[in-house]
């Protein structure tokens, strides 16, 4: 288990539990009661710690390397998944994963950002930072869903769109804007879930949805705390202050009306009980799709556009 900086007291207790278990392996000493007491302390400390996380600490949790990623959710929730590749214009971008499959009995199109789980996969998926061809692939899948009247589920987990020169040369800003436009034009249900880090336009490109769900300890912001601090304070050392000012937590964004539902995580974060988290998000997605099922295409499109116009009006007000 990878422990975060603020989890040191929890790590110390779990280390003691592991030591006791190691000492008694193969021996006759019974210390079950002591282990049970320590485990109860760990559980209590986890609850108290995660009940009062600061925005900066939530940023750490959202970026936890053992947190379930896009492909983990697809593998557990989507059956008969058939991935589709390429944007039919330039290249394949593995930062965006997408395809057709079945979600709890209904055919869907799934699109998500995959960060990778080890060095090799992170490089292969470019750490979840999509290039223009990735967003154009997403547009192709969105249009396919619209053509065949299939609901769309998107899974958001990115630090942002890839900022390299090559991406700018191929029209990164246009690709993001066109993805947002494509989302707004859809006449099928579109449900988006922010499962980790939702970074700026790179996230909203596939999150302009009828229902935006967000995990309890995920973050969603126009800029990273480090980037914001570098601009405002000329130093990334003020990232904690920036995280507070950005109001990037699920709780703040629900209050602001930017997201529709906060999906609760297991005690200690999604990385501690991955299977439980995946099932919980699956239930939330199912609820959202059921809620949208009876709306016709014109109503879906009108309500979706109005929803995001209202968010803009609130910001101007």
UniProtKB/Swiss-Prot annotation:
Record-linked NCBIfam families: accA, AccA_sub, PRK05724.1
Q: Where in this chain does the record put each CoA carboxyltransferase C-terminal domain?
A: 37-291
Q: What is its EC number?
A: 2.1.3.15
Q: Name one GO molecular function term.
A: ATP binding
Which pathway does UniProt place it in? Lipid metabolism; malonyl-CoA biosynthesis; malonyl-CoA from acetyl-CoA: step 1/1
Q: Which SUPFAM superfamilies match?
A: ClpP/crotonase (SSF52096)
What organism is listed for this UniProt entry? Answer: Rhodospirillum centenum (strain ATCC 51521 / SW)
Per its record, how is this protein called by name? Answer: Acetyl-coenzyme A carboxylase carboxyl transferase subunit alpha
Family under the similarity heading: Belongs to the AccA family.
Assigned GO CC terms: acetyl-CoA carboxylase complex
């Amino acid at each position: 288990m990878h422990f975060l900086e603020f989890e040191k007291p929890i790590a110390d207790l779990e280390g003691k539990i592991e030591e006791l278990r190691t000492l008694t392996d193969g021996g006759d000493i019974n210390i079950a009661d002591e282990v049970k007491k320590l485990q109860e302390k760990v559980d209590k400390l986890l609850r108290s710690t995660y009940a009062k996380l600061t925005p900066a600490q939530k940023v750490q949790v959202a970026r936890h390397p053992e947190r379930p990623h896009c492909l983990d959710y697809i593998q557990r929730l989507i059956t008969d998944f058939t991935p589709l590749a390429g944007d039919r214009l330039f290249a394949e971008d593995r930062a965006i994963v997408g395809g057709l499959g079945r979600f709890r009995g209904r055919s869907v199109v799934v699109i998500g950002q995959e960060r990778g789980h080890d060095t090799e996969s992170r490089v292969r998926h470019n750490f979840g930072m999509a290039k223009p061809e990735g967003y154009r692939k997403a547009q192709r899948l969105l249009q396919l869903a619209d053509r065949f009247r299939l609901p769309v589920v998107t899974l958001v987990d990115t630090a942002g769109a890839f900022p390299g020169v090559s991406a700018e040369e191929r029209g990164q800003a246009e690709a993001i804007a066109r993805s947002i436009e494509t989302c707004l034009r859809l006449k099928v249900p579109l449900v988006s879930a922010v499962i980790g880090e939702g970074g700026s336009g790179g996230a909203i490109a596939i999150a302009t949805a009828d229902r935006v769900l967000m995990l309890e300890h995920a973050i969603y912001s126009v800029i990273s705390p480090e980037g914001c601090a570098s601009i405002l304070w000329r130093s990334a050392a003020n990232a904690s202050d920036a995280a507070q000012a950005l109001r990037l937590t699920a709780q703040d964004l629900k209050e602001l009306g930017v997201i529709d539902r906060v999906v609760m995580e297991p005690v200690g974060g999604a990385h501690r009980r991955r299977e439980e988290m995946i099932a919980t998000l699956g239930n939330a997605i199912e609820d959202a799709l059921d809620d949208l099922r009876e709306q016709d295409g014109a109503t879906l499109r009108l309500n979706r556009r109005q929803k995001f116009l209202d968010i803009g009006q609130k910001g101007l007000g």
